[in-house]
Curated annotation (Swiss-Prot):
Originating organism: Aeropyrum pernix
Any GO BP: DNA repair
Protein name: DNA repair and recombination protein RadA
Keywords from the UniProt entry: ATP-binding, DNA damage, DNA recombination, DNA-binding, Nucleotide-binding
Listed result of changing residue 201 to R: In strain: OH2
Gene this protein is translated from: radA
Reported effect, residue 58 to T: In strain: OH3
Amino acid sequence: MGEDKREIKDITDLPGVGPTTAQKLMEAGYTTLEAIAAATPQEVSQATGIPILTAQKIVDAAREALNIDFKTAYDLKIESMNIKKITTGSRNLDELLGGGIETKTITELFGEFGSGKTQICHQLSVNVQLPEDKGGLEGKAVYIDTEGTFRWERIEQMARGVGLDPDEVMKNIYWIRAINSHHQIAIVDKLFTMVKNDNIKLVVVDSVTSHFRAEFPGRENLAMRQQLLNRHLHQLMRLADIFNVAVVITNQVMARPDVFYGDPTQAVGGHVLGHAPGVRVYLKKSRGNKRIARVVDAPHLPEGETVFAITEWGIRDPE
């Protein structure tokens, strides 16, 4: 008789995982069945030193235990009914996004400095805590800060703006400063345990590319940079999909020298970043406190743009 997959509740229940192997897996950030099932055998082997064939068996067993298999289109339709949305605070912006920021996907906000990327991330970290009938998910947020842009004072203002207790709101935002690209990747690996065991509904990475660009400059380092960035983005995609959370990443822009007409700016990160997010939103400055948002890539949304405002109390529609 084979081992009943329903008996596998923890990584220590997986066939071939004794105390030593379990310790290696946990030290590498693979602390849950979901984290192992979402990884490739190569990733597990490289991170732990476990032989590739053993890693293959462990990953296969984790996937079988979680019943990762083919689904019908009807199954996907039923699953889509579980997708939730977080209000941005601006009705205009919500309508552009089809109702708000979706769970089970990555939303990328890209634009130049001062275009509103970090402001929206702060607002979402507050709004995710609202009741569902007010556009929230009654959940907590994780804020991975790579550039030191997080401000608790701004959270305080925004919390007051939506009628929530600022101190209670701040207690429900887990902030961490990522010091380099490998630390950033390790943080996301750890989130597979955090998200499973806590009521986390939003993960923010602000910004997703800055460390990778700084640490791997030049064309000679491009392949390594893109490989690491690809792994990082796929972990975020798996996190969003497995746990039904919203993932929001910010990104910088650069000018394309080959564009002579129209807007020459594009998001950094190349094709790797271009394929990962489910929704890509380009933000631009306008007059005063107004900003322009344009959906540039989303399979379920039409391309379009709208105007929102950054006010004392947060993201709002312009007056």
